[in-house]
C-alpha cells in the first residue's frame, strides 16, 4: 500500500522502505517498481537516491551488516564464556526474526564480490571481530576460532530461518530447543 503522506525522500528513507517490503513480503517482492509504489513516486525518481536495483541491494547489504554488528556488539558487552556465547546467539536469532527479509537478502560475504565495498567490508569485519571475541572467550583461537565461528553462524542461521519460515510445528518451546542447541555447541567447542 503506497504511503499517504509524502515525506522528503532521501537515500535512508528509500532503503528503509525497501527493508519494510523485504520483511513483510519477502525478497521476490522487492522490485524498483514495487518500491516506487510504496514510496508514492515514479520509478525513475528512485535513481536520484539509489544506483538501480544493484545499488539498492548493496545499500541493503551494508545496512544489514551494520545492524547485525550493532546487535552482536551490544549483546557482548560485559559478558564472557558460555554466557557471552548464549547472549550473542540469542541476539543473532532475534535479529533474524526481526529482519527476516533483510537478513535473507544479503547472505553473501563481501569477500566473494569482484569489487570490494569498503563500508560493507568494515561492517562485516566488525561482526567478525565480535564473533572472534566470543570464540576467544571459549578458548578458541586461530583456525579453531574461524571453524567455531562458522559453526555458530550456521547453527543460528539454520535455526532462526527455520523458525521464521514456520518450520517448527510441534508444540515444544522453540526457546528451550534453541537454548539446548547453543549449550551443545558450547560444550563441543570447550572440549
Residue spans for each PLM region:
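Short hydrophobic clusters on alpha-helical segments that form packing/core surfaces
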Residues: 14-22, 30, 64, 68, ...
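Amphipathic C-terminal alpha-helical segment
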Residues: 154-171, 186-191
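Hydrophobic alpha-helical connector segments
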Residues: 73-101, 124-126, 142, 152
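Amphipathic alpha-helical segments used for helix-helix packing
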Residues: 97-115, 161-169
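Amphipathic alpha-helical segments enriched in hydrophobic/aromatic and basic residues
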Residues: 22, 31-32, 53-64, 103, ...
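Amphipathic alpha-helical packing segments from all-alpha helical-bundle domains
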Residues: 113-139, 146-150, 175-187
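Short hydrophobic/aromatic patch on the recognition helix
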Residues: 39-50
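Basic, helix-initiating cap at the start of DNA-binding domains
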Residues: 1-25, 33-34, 38, 55-58
Amino acid at each position: 500500500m503506497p504511503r499517504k503522506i509524502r515525506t522528503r525522500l532521501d537515500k535512508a528513507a528509500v532503503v528503509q522502505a525497501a527493508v519494510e517490503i523485504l520483511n513483510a513480503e519477502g525478497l521476490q517482492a522487492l522490485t524498483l517498481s514495487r518500491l516506487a509504489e510504496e514510496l508514492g513516486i515514479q520509478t525513475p525518481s528512485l535513481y536520484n537516491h539509489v544506483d538501480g536495483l544493484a545499488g539498492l541491494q548493496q545499500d541493503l547489504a551494508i545496512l544489514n551488516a551494520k545492524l547485525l554488528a550493532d546487535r552482536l556488539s551490544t549483546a557482548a558487552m560485559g559478558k564472557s564464556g558460555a554466557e557471552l556465547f548464549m547472549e550473542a546467539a540469542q541476539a543473532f536469532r532475534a535479529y533474524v526474526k526481526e529482519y527476516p527479509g533483510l537478513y535473507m537478502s544479503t547472505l553473501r560475504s563481501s569477500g566473494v564480490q569482484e569489487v570490494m565495498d569498503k563500508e560493507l567490508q568494515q561492517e562485516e569485519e566488525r561482526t567478525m571481530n565480535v564473533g572472534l571475541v566470543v570464540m576467544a572467550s571459549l578458548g578458541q583461537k586461530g583456525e579453531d576460532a574461524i571453524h567455531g565461528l562458522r559453526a555458530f553462524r550456521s547453527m543460528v542461521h539454520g535455526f532462526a530461518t527455520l523458525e521464521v519460515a514456520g518450520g517448527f510445528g510441534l508444540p515444544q518451546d522453540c526457546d528451550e530447543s534453541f537454548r539446548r542447541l547453543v549449550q551443545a555447541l558450547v560444550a563441543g567447542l570447550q572440549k
